[in-house]
């Protein structure tokens, strides 16, 4: 559902800044899948190594006789002839237990990142002009925000989805294990290879956090359960999001372009050169909105291109672009960044007319 058609719809509804977070969510989900696949590949390679070691060790059986005269075959397993496990990353030997532990932590961290990215989509695509600062947004922030009557009334389906996620045991486990391993300490996970008839052991260890006991669980079961939960949640989210953003609840006074940039050069007087970005008014300056939200977007057959609006001041002109009526001033500062947002401009009522260009 996250395709070029949806991208164009976001442009039409003036919430295009949400698209960057849609692609980032999919990137996070892809990373989660990669972690799971690589963990399984590590276990598979270690298992294969163990099987081959056992085949080799069986060739070393020696004949022996027990005390009661029974003929037997014996084999000796020591640290010197035990299997050696290692994997290569970028040509370097890496301890598989280290890689297993890192990838397992990454698996849950990127799962949480995916849900936080979904919250950024909500912030940019639904809250829009009422959105929170991007650096303060995460899934818990959106859960709290959408439990407020204003937003639960405006977007009831999204509120239901958020509460469903918050109340899910699967999400609560993901959040708990991520916070434990990210901020507190390791968990006693187990990865051991069975030899001579015994089975492999692959477990996520038990842990106790915020008065809740989380029991040990078979690794493969939890990996698959988390993947299923994440993918199902994402599909449900996209359905709900598409039903909600078309309401255009908080997208007033958004623009994807300005009228142009006027440049005026005076021959022999370079210090008097004049250049300014402007918007042509269809009405009086007084009748224009108090705020504008601008993201420069160009839609063509080759795709959609967007850029932050770099102008700190935008003048308002009449039908003649040299007839200056007033100005808007940027309400926030932008830096050198790839993040896109609808930059807020506030009407400056302190000056009007040509003095605005000074």
Q: Where are these predicted regions, by residue range?
A:
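Acidic, Ser/Thr/Gly/Pro-rich intrinsically disordered interaction regions
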Residues: 1-109, 119-358
